[in-house]
Amino acid sequence: EAAILDRQELNVERDKNRPCVIMWSMGNESGYGPNTDAAIRWTKQRDCTRYVHYEGVPDNYGVYSDVNDFKFIGESDVYSRMYASAPHCKEYCESEHAVRPMMLCEYCHAMGNGPGDLKEYWDVIYSHPNLFGAFVWEWCDHAFYAGDAENGMPKFYYGGDSGEQPNSDNFCVDGLVSPDRKPHQGLKELKAVIQPVRVEAVNLEKGEFRVTNLFDFIYLSRFEC
């Protein structure tokens, strides 16, 4: 418990004055128990202005089968999940167990041909106020520039390319952008899905479209079609 509390106290004291911090996390994929609850209680006592989440709380060590088995263990303010399916999110948000808002602290793993199902997730998010957002894992491929290849293209090393052992092969290459921050196709898809102005075809033959404004404080009159 002392080690967990020490890390959380340092985390809060370091970042408490940063306005971009809207929520405290108790860690990542590190089990759950009374030590976690102790960290949650300390954090809420130190800073009562922000929510607290921990993905490990509702799982109770991963033991659950369906929406009717959701139990809120401990004192997390939100139902925080990783990689729950879009139908699962919809079912929770519409169930009698949805006593706390839901958040996907990880979803749509951007590895290989990913991320996928972005539109399906955001259809659920936009239609359910108690599902307040989701975070793609992850932003950037973890590799380093190793000069240019013979064809002139940049060469990036990862997963044992430098002879390091052990390694995780290509599991670190799972970002929305490349190491030099060039967008992958997944980032372009995500941008289209979460764009604040939506245009949908109603009747193409008649030239009818539905325009939806998802901005909170901006009118569409400032834009040109």
What does each of the following model-derived ranges do?
Residues 1-210, 215-221:
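Extended substrate-binding grooves/exosites of carbohydrate-active enzymes
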